[in-house]
UniProtKB/Swiss-Prot annotation:
It is an enzyme of class 2 (transferase). The lineage of its organism: Bacteria, Pseudomonadati, Pseudomonadota, Gammaproteobacteria, Enterobacterales. The keyword rRNA-binding does not apply. Residues 5-267 form the Pyruvate carboxyltransferase domain. This is 2-isopropylmalate synthase. Inhibited by EDTA, mercuric salts and by leucine. Inhibition by leucine is non-competitive with respect to 3-methyl-2-oxobutanoate and competitive with respect to acetyl-CoA, and is more sensitive at pH 6.5 than pH 8.5. Belongs to the alpha-IPM synthase/homocitrate synthase family. LeuA type 1 subfamily. SUPFAM superfamilies: 2-isopropylmalate synthase LeuA, allosteric (dimerisation) domain, Aldolase. The gene is leuA.
Length: 523
């Protein structure tokens, strides 16, 4: 009987580090729910000590997720571990993941310490984490460049201290697959208590072999793989979990292991991460790219028509990618829209039916026919904007001709007040943004503007993703409409609402801090 490989997802921690703007707590929760639906065993959802916002999002996810183990990262520092436990304690069960560097380079130049001191610190911090939970994971940062004898000493000590999972990261993506497999085999040969822990691997894609390294490690005995959906992450990214999962499934003949992932949810989860993180998936991306199951060669097309297995080692259906079909029109009622969402596997709690149906009717009136991908875009891109809005786009118009100069008029609801402004700009989008900024008075610098089509043909929805800089912080916004200028305006309004909410959160934190200080003085 094959053994299980635990899937540890770090999209919301290591993956998020690649984004130009941090995700909101609600966006993180949306991704966490998608990962839970896909069946990941463990999800690492943040680094609570890093900021109040990260603490809040970890706490929210820990309170909500029931079918996956929620994990938070902590350095081998007392405060890190204590704060992680504080954020996670609302969960029925949780994991603390603590780490320290073990390579000679990191020990000498970063930690300015010795291997013996590193081992002593690791043991102390694993024991401290065990005071909060019996599920403690310990990582040897830069294990790929750590001599295996040194690594074995650290691993043995961490297991004796109570770590149930030992993670071996190729932190800088330096190791070759045969080398990495050798490290795992070497640990099994050298560590006498290794049977008391699960060996995990965490690989990076700097040389394009993160997935290869993870699979080689599994073949050598690792039983947990860490990675991120779509391979997002620092520098060149993390190990792409969807690739590892499907490689294990397709090549079960030689891997002789399995995962508990619902692989029919892979495509939808990948799309959710792509849309929320504003990271388009390359067409030639393995497993989830738009061209992953496309056949253009005449010879290949002929072979596939005769027998799909001639050129397909897996099917689109195996990852949940079914043939896109016509579903709904403006004459469809709420029940029909709800039924189609149920057919696609969504529950009532996954989206707001009132918002979805209103948006559906507007879109159906414009384009006549609404497809599955339209519904998902309306449900889950617009969902990010369902929180109470201080700013709302009431009206806009743009005049432009053959010259570069355009004029925009905008009405914006600011709380209970409607304000209007007009402005010129270098094109219609710039004019809209100038007018909006005049109304709000916010000093924002546009640092990224992306336009992507959601759907097919001339009636496709246009999704605009923007990132702005505001007083040293970056904020992300998204807008969706059949008109690009309208999408752009909605994206900017979304950004401004995110800035406004961040300011309100800061005010609330200051108020709580002041109340705490006042209570101290009273005592």
């Amino acid at each position: 009987m094959s053994q299980q490989v635990i899937i540890f997802d770090t999209t919301l921690r290591d993956g998020e580090q690649a984004l130009q703007a941090s995700l909101s707590a609600k966006e993180k929760l949306q991704i966490a729910l998608a990962l839970e639906r896909m069946g990941v065993d463990v999800m690492e959802v943040g680094f609570p000590v890093s900021s109040p916002g990260d603490f809040e999002s970890v706490q929210t996810i820990a309170r909500t997720i029931k079918n996956s183990r929620v994990c938070a990262l902590a350095r081998c520092v007392e405060k890190d571990i204590d704060v992680a436990a504080q954020a996670l304690k609302v969960a029925d069960a949780f994991r603390i993941h603590t780490f320290i560097a073990t390579s000679p380079m990191h020990i000498a130049t970063k930690l300015r310490s010795t291997l013996d001191e590193v081992i002593e610190r690791a043991v102390y911090m694993v024991k401290r984490a065990r005071n909060y939970t019996d599920d403690v994971e310990f990582s040897c940062e830069d294990a790929g460049r750590t001599p295996v004898d040194d690594l074995a000493r650290v691993v043995e000590a961490a297991i004796n201290a109570g770590a149930r999972t030992i993670n071996i990261p190729d932190t800088v993506g330096y190791t070759m697959p045969f080398e990495f497999a050798g490290i795992i085999s070497g640990l099994y040969e050298r560590v006498p208590n290794i049977d008391k822990a699960i060996i995990s691997v965490h690989t990076h894609d700097d040389l394009g072999i993160a997935v290869g390294n993870s699979l080689a490690a599994v073949h050598a005995g690792a039983r947990q793989v860490e990675g991120a959906m779509n391979g997002i992450g620092e520098r060149a990214g993390n190990c792409a979990l969807e690739e590892v999962i499907m490689a294990i499934k397709v090549r079960k003949d030689i891997m002789n292991v399995h995962t508990n992932i619902n692989h029919h949810e892979i495509w939808r989860t990948s799309q959710t991460v792509s849309q929320i993180c504003n990271m388009p998936i390359p067409a030639n991306k393995a497993i989830v790219g738009s061209g992953a199951f496309a056949h253009s060669s005449g010879i290949h097309q002929d072979g596939v028509l005769k027998n799909r297995e001639n050129y397909e080692i897996m099917t689109p259906e195996s990852i949940g990618l079914n043939q896109i079909q016509l579903n709904l029109t403006s004459r469809s009622g709420r029940a029909a829209v709800k039924h189609r969402m149920e057919e696609m596997g969504y529950k009532d709690t996954d989206y707001n039916m009132d918002h979805l149906y209103d948006a559906f009717l507007k879109l159906a009136d414009k384009k006549g026919q609404v497809f599955d991908y339209d519904l998902e875009a309306l449900a889950f891109i617009n969902k990010q904007q369902e929180e109470p809005e201080h700013f709302r786009l009431d009206y806009f118009s743009v005049q432009s001709g053959s010259s570069d100069i355009a004029t925009a008029s905008v009405k914006l609801a600011c709380g209970e007040e409607i304000k209007a402004e007009a402005a010129n700009g270098n094109g219609p989008v710039d004019a809209i943004y100038q007018a909006i900024n005049r109304i709000t008075g916010y000093d924002v610098e546009l640092v990224k503007y992306d336009l992507n089509a959601k759907g097919q043909g001339k009636d496709a929805l246009g999704q605009v993703d923007i990132v702005v800089n505001h007083h040293g912080r970056r904020f992300h916004g998204v807008g969706l409409a059949t008109d690009i200028v309208e999408s752009s305006a909605k994206a900017m309004v979304h950004v401004l609402n995110n800035i406004w909410r961040a300011a309100e959160v800061e005010k609330e934190l200051q108020r709580k801090a002041q109340n705490k200080e006042n209570n101290k003085e009273t005592v």
